[in-house]
Amino acid sequence: MTVTNVAFNPWTWEFTLEGLTVAGKNNNPPLLSLDRFYVNASAQTLVELAPVIDEVTVDGLNAVVALDDEDMRRLMNGHGSAEGGSSEKASSESSSLPSFAVYNISVKNSSLQVLDRARAIDQSVTDFNLELPFVSTLANSKSSLVTPKLSMKLNGTPIFATGSTQPFGTTLSARLNMKISNLDLAPVFKLVPALNTPSLMLENGRLSTEVNVVFRNATSGKPGKMLVSGTVNVNDLTAVQQISNRVQPLASFKKASLQLTELDLLEHQASVGSIVIQDPKVHFVNTPSGLNVSQTAQGFSSGAAADSGKDSGSNSGWHWRVDSVQIRNGNATWNDSTVRPAAKINVTALNATVTGLTNAANAKPAKAEAGAKVFGGMLSLAADVTPAPLVVNATLKASGLQAAQLASYIRNATGFDASGAVSLNVKAAVKGSAVTGSGTASLTNLQVKQGKSTLVSARTASVKLGSLDTAKQSVNVDSILLDTAVVNAVMTSAGLNLMPSKAGAAKKAAQKDADAKTTEKAGKPWQWKVASADVKNSRFNFRDTSVKPNAAITVSDINASVKNLSSAEGAAATVKMSAGTAGGTLAADGTVTLSPMTADVSTTLSGINMKSLSSVMTAYAGIGAQSGTLESKGRFGLASEKDKQVASWAGDISMAKFNMLNAKGRSLMTWNNAALTGLAVKTTDPVTLCVKKAEIDQPGTRETKAIRELSGLASLLTGKDKYAKKTEKYLGGSIVLNGVRYENGRFSAEGIDGNAVATALLTKLSGAMSTKLQ
């Protein structure tokens, strides 16, 4: 380092430094050269107990900063670590600028070059000239005749600023107007490490500004001002990132503009007229290694965390207001390779406006509106927002959202394909951590498929949410409607087709465990109520190919309703249902409770064609029917017995023209009419079944022939012809059985020792049904 001249006048407090040179390494150009540095300090410094400088002149300052130089990196890193603690402490002690005053500032013929060969950085500021009348935070009436101006070239692009001044007394102020036109930002971006990482690289951008800076001296009891206002425009900004060794787009916009009404650096107040972003595009990419924007955010958050201690003190006192924020014609894409097939979702025509956003206390809420095309439909949002403390009241509306747009996620979770149109009209309020909501949701033209087979379809499924309150942990649903639904259930040896795939079931089980743990930690369970749930004009088709013969049944014209279903202890809900099956009708009416689980429901079957139910009867009871008509009335019950849920049914059954078949399809027994009075069944272990009275009118010829053969054989063996005659008198009339029971795999009845026909009937029933009822 060399210096040509150093001079200091103690009487006038003038300091002059001339010919300063700091040589570069290995015969490189000087790192720093300074032709002349002049400072004229004022005696007012002693009065104000703060620096007061009458004049500062810097002439011919030329610096070269080599970012890839080891000494420079050591200096920069050491500076950050050594002074970080003290600067943090200083910033926490005061959130305002220190007291000082500098007048008649002049910087001439200066330049700065920044180099980093490893990152191909070669940026320069040349022909730098700056003149300012003053920069002051002190109440001082000193005059200045300097007219503010600025000129320089940034990488060859001229930047000019001109100004005016009111130099005397209480009106001491200066204004500087700076204009930048179409400055290429790409070279400037290279100077910022956070903008040159694999997760974020800014490639293009053009900057245009017109900014006014006002310096107003603190005089006549009025505080000093440092005010900034103007407009900033950035055009054609493009950001990319590296994913799987490929450079892919991250974000871009056609134009972003900022209209700064006033920024008061001393009073920590900011007023923004408008922020407008035109044609923004954002590309979200989710891979097994993570979400691309999360990786980008981590780069910023690490730097922000390091500076948070320094900045928290200075930022805490800021008051701000933004009159308007707009996004026009935005687009976003979502690509997710974590599911198969890969998901791709597009958001287009995104337009959003926020007005009156501020952190001022007791301010009116900001108004927000947004709309976009997504999932093949339209989505809109209107909200009132108060930032601090956070309060949001919003209305979300959607129409024509296509479930098929989420096909990859639905298939990945369940193994099914789904389609349908979703509409929403939801109101929500957020106050701190509490959320309340209400609204409606509907799904039309629903279809759930597995391959080419349709599992579920519905014309309409809708929900009306009365209220949701996370603070109270309560949900009240006004109504649920399922209209014109068709369910096609098929049981195979692999399981029920309506169940999710193994992968989906595993995820569902894992989620259920996680939810259970969350509920356990939360302590208090959620309370919910459904005022009304209805199923209209629906059908249920069932086939079971896992049994021989295959079983099939169809329940059509299903109309059902549930009222006041609730999680409350002992709350009873009313249920009502009617449907058609096997050529007849069935109906149910009664009450159920969920806590504890109970049911008391009357049931009615009328005109049921037994032949239509033959496959189901054979598969699950071991007997079928060639013909017959079933009528039934009774009550279904569900209750807890010895800590086990037990289902029961009690009532009367009658059958006409009944021809019973065994599992092989052969006629087992026939009769014209049969009535079971006082039938009671319970799903205990083993199953309990009893009939108070069974009447069978006119047994068929197959039974009478079998009994004649049995009685004839008995008479030959015993030599008692009276036994055969006694048996014969039962064959032409009716059979009455009292106290029929099913125990230990066999049917029995009271007082049938002399009734061979009755004994034969029960024997055949036992043989045919025992394996199914065990």
Regions found by a protein language model. Name each.
Residues 159-161, 207, 228, 437, ...:
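Structural detector for hydrophobic anchor residues on beta-strands
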Residues 76-85, 294-304, 499-510, 717-722:
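Surface-exposed loop/turn segments flanking beta-strands in extracellular/periplasmic regions
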Residues 70-78, 194, 248-249, 289-297, ...:
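Flexible, surface-exposed loop regions and adjacent strand-edge segments
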Residues 41, 132, 180, 215, ...:
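Hydrophobic residues in beta-strands and at strand termini
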Residues 5-71, 91-113, 144-146, 172, ...:
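Flexible beta-edge/linker motif
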Residues 1-25, 166, 170, 179, ...:
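N-terminal amphipathic/hydrophobic interface segments
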Residues 36, 83-195, 223, 304-405, ...:
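Elongated, acidic membrane-bridging lipid-handling scaffolds
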